[in-house]
Protein backbone atom coordinates (compact mmCIF):
# COMPACT_ATOMS: atom_id res chain seq x y z
CA UNK A 1 0.00 0.00 0.00
CA UNK A 2 2.98 2.37 0.43
CA UNK A 3 4.78 1.58 -2.83
CA UNK A 4 3.70 4.76 -4.64
CA UNK A 5 4.63 7.10 -1.78
CA UNK A 6 7.99 5.34 -1.28
CA UNK A 7 8.70 5.63 -4.99
CA UNK A 8 8.01 9.37 -4.80
CA UNK A 9 10.32 9.75 -1.78
CA UNK A 10 13.17 7.92 -3.54
CA UNK A 11 12.60 9.87 -6.76
CA UNK A 12 12.63 13.20 -4.92
CA UNK A 13 15.75 12.27 -2.96
CA UNK A 14 17.95 10.76 -5.64
CA UNK A 15 16.92 12.85 -8.64
CA UNK A 16 16.97 16.20 -6.88
CA UNK A 17 19.68 15.74 -4.25
CA UNK A 18 22.90 17.67 -4.94
CA UNK A 19 25.02 14.60 -4.17
CA UNK A 20 24.69 11.15 -2.60
CA UNK A 21 24.99 12.48 0.98
CA UNK A 22 22.32 15.14 0.37
CA UNK A 23 20.02 12.62 -1.31
CA UNK A 24 20.37 10.22 1.61
CA UNK A 25 19.51 13.02 4.07
CA UNK A 26 16.36 13.82 2.07
CA UNK A 27 15.40 10.13 2.10
CA UNK A 28 15.97 9.64 5.84
CA UNK A 29 14.25 12.89 6.78
CA UNK A 30 11.23 11.81 4.74
CA UNK A 31 11.11 8.32 6.25
CA UNK A 32 11.65 9.42 9.86
CA UNK A 33 10.09 12.89 9.82
CA UNK A 34 7.88 12.11 12.83
CA UNK A 35 10.70 10.82 15.04
CA UNK A 36 13.12 13.72 15.45
CA UNK A 37 16.00 12.03 13.66
CA UNK A 38 19.28 13.99 13.77
CA UNK A 39 21.53 13.54 10.75
CA UNK A 40 25.16 14.59 10.88
CA UNK A 41 27.27 15.20 7.78
CA UNK A 42 30.67 13.74 8.60
CA UNK A 43 32.30 16.03 6.03
CA UNK A 44 31.02 19.22 7.65
CA UNK A 45 33.84 21.78 7.92
CA UNK A 46 33.20 22.56 11.60
CA UNK A 47 33.16 18.88 12.54
CA UNK A 48 36.41 18.27 10.68
CA UNK A 49 37.96 21.37 12.29
CA UNK A 50 37.28 19.79 15.71
CA UNK A 51 39.53 16.93 14.65
CA UNK A 52 42.35 19.09 13.26
CA UNK A 53 44.75 18.19 16.09
CA UNK A 54 44.27 14.48 15.33
CA UNK A 55 44.97 15.15 11.64
CA UNK A 56 48.10 17.15 12.41
CA UNK A 57 49.44 14.47 14.72
CA UNK A 58 48.69 11.80 12.14
CA UNK A 59 50.47 13.64 9.37
CA UNK A 60 53.50 14.91 11.23
CA UNK A 61 54.06 12.25 13.92
CA UNK A 62 52.45 9.15 12.34
CA UNK A 63 51.42 8.15 15.87
CA UNK A 64 48.62 5.80 14.80
CA UNK A 65 50.94 3.43 12.99
CA UNK A 66 53.33 3.19 15.95
CA UNK A 67 50.65 2.84 18.64
CA UNK A 68 48.39 0.37 16.84
CA UNK A 69 51.30 -1.79 15.69
CA UNK A 70 52.54 -1.97 19.29
CA UNK A 71 49.09 -3.22 20.32
CA UNK A 72 48.90 -5.71 17.45
CA UNK A 73 52.29 -7.19 18.41
CA UNK A 74 50.68 -8.74 21.51
CA UNK A 75 47.02 -8.66 20.45
CA UNK A 76 45.21 -11.90 21.42
CA UNK A 77 42.78 -11.67 18.47
CA UNK A 78 43.19 -11.50 14.72
CA UNK A 79 43.95 -7.94 13.56
CA UNK A 80 40.77 -6.33 12.23
CA UNK A 81 42.53 -3.41 10.52
CA UNK A 82 46.18 -2.59 9.92
CA UNK A 83 47.48 0.99 10.05
CA UNK A 84 49.37 2.80 7.31
CA UNK A 85 52.00 5.47 7.86
CA UNK A 86 49.25 8.06 7.25
CA UNK A 87 45.67 7.02 7.96
CA UNK A 88 43.94 9.87 6.15
CA UNK A 89 42.43 10.44 2.73
CA UNK A 90 42.61 13.68 0.79
CA UNK A 91 39.32 14.86 -0.71
CA UNK A 92 38.53 17.10 -3.65
CA UNK A 93 35.67 17.09 -6.13
CA UNK A 94 35.50 13.52 -7.49
CA UNK A 95 38.72 12.67 -5.65
CA UNK A 96 39.30 10.56 -2.54
CA UNK A 97 42.83 9.21 -2.34
CA UNK A 98 45.28 8.12 0.34
CA UNK A 99 47.92 10.50 1.63
CA UNK A 100 51.39 8.94 1.49
CA UNK A 101 54.37 10.38 3.35
CA UNK A 102 57.83 10.05 1.81
CA UNK A 103 60.28 10.54 4.67
CA UNK A 104 63.32 10.56 2.37
CA UNK A 105 61.97 13.65 0.55
CA UNK A 106 59.85 15.03 3.42
CA UNK A 107 56.85 15.42 1.13
CA UNK A 108 53.28 14.18 1.16
CA UNK A 109 51.89 12.67 -2.02
CA UNK A 110 48.24 12.15 -2.88
CA UNK A 111 48.04 8.61 -4.24
CA UNK A 112 47.28 8.19 -7.97
CA UNK A 113 47.66 11.94 -8.62
CA UNK A 114 50.43 14.45 -9.26
CA UNK A 115 49.43 16.42 -6.13
CA UNK A 116 52.14 16.85 -3.50
CA UNK A 117 52.43 18.94 -0.34
CA UNK A 118 55.34 20.10 1.75
CA UNK A 119 54.75 19.87 5.53
CA UNK A 120 54.13 23.63 5.70
CA UNK A 121 51.65 23.51 2.82
CA UNK A 122 49.79 20.66 4.45
CA UNK A 123 49.59 22.48 7.81
CA UNK A 124 48.04 25.43 6.00
CA UNK A 125 45.62 23.14 4.13
CA UNK A 126 44.37 21.62 7.40
CA UNK A 127 43.91 25.08 8.89
CA UNK A 128 42.02 26.50 5.91
CA UNK A 129 40.26 23.40 4.57
CA UNK A 130 39.85 20.67 7.21
CA UNK A 131 36.94 19.29 5.17
CA UNK A 132 39.49 18.14 2.56
CA UNK A 133 40.69 15.39 4.89
CA UNK A 134 38.91 12.18 5.79
CA UNK A 135 39.89 9.41 8.22
CA UNK A 136 40.39 5.83 7.17
CA UNK A 137 39.29 2.79 9.19
CA UNK A 138 41.94 3.41 11.89
CA UNK A 139 40.99 7.02 12.66
CA UNK A 140 37.27 7.08 11.87
CA UNK A 141 36.17 5.89 15.35
CA UNK A 142 38.27 8.65 16.96
CA UNK A 143 36.70 11.35 14.77
CA UNK A 144 33.24 9.98 15.57
CA UNK A 145 33.82 9.80 19.32
CA UNK A 146 35.34 13.30 19.42
CA UNK A 147 32.43 14.86 17.52
CA UNK A 148 29.58 12.72 18.91
CA UNK A 149 30.71 11.07 22.17
CA UNK A 150 28.92 7.84 23.03
CA UNK A 151 28.75 5.92 26.30
CA UNK A 152 28.75 2.45 24.80
CA UNK A 153 29.36 0.60 21.57
CA UNK A 154 27.37 -2.57 20.85
CA UNK A 155 28.94 -4.88 18.30
CA UNK A 156 29.79 -8.39 17.23
CA UNK A 157 33.01 -10.22 18.05
CA UNK A 158 35.01 -8.79 15.16
CA UNK A 159 33.77 -5.27 15.83
CA UNK A 160 34.65 -5.49 19.52
CA UNK A 161 38.16 -6.73 18.62
CA UNK A 162 38.46 -3.82 16.17
CA UNK A 163 37.62 -1.33 18.93
CA UNK A 164 40.02 -2.96 21.38
CA UNK A 165 42.96 -2.63 19.03
CA UNK A 166 42.32 1.14 18.93
CA UNK A 167 41.91 1.71 22.69
CA UNK A 168 45.50 2.93 23.20
CA UNK A 169 45.02 5.38 20.33
CA UNK A 170 41.98 6.87 22.09
CA UNK A 171 44.05 7.25 25.26
CA UNK A 172 46.90 8.89 23.36
CA UNK A 173 44.53 11.52 21.95
CA UNK A 174 42.74 11.97 25.33
CA UNK A 175 39.40 10.88 23.86
CA UNK A 176 37.06 8.97 26.16
CA UNK A 177 36.88 5.31 25.15
CA UNK A 178 33.31 4.01 25.21
CA UNK A 179 32.16 0.87 26.98
CA UNK A 180 32.04 -2.21 24.76
CA UNK A 181 29.02 -4.51 24.81
CA UNK A 182 28.93 -7.78 22.89
CA UNK A 183 25.61 -8.04 21.10
CA UNK A 184 23.51 -11.17 21.36
CA UNK A 185 24.06 -13.62 18.55
CA UNK A 186 22.94 -17.12 17.63
CA UNK A 187 23.97 -19.95 15.36
CA UNK A 188 21.32 -21.71 13.30
CA UNK A 189 22.01 -25.46 13.38
CA UNK A 190 20.33 -27.49 10.65
CA UNK A 191 19.18 -31.09 11.11
CA UNK A 192 22.31 -32.66 9.57
CA UNK A 193 24.63 -30.61 11.77
CA UNK A 194 22.54 -31.44 14.83
CA UNK A 195 22.88 -35.17 14.13
CA UNK A 196 26.67 -34.80 13.93
CA UNK A 197 26.72 -32.83 17.18
CA UNK A 198 24.63 -35.51 18.88
CA UNK A 199 26.87 -38.26 17.52
CA UNK A 200 29.96 -36.47 18.83
CA UNK A 201 28.14 -35.73 22.09
CA UNK A 202 28.76 -32.03 21.75
Where are these regions (language model features)?
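N-terminal targeting/trafficking signals and adjacent low-complexity tails
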Residues: 1-202
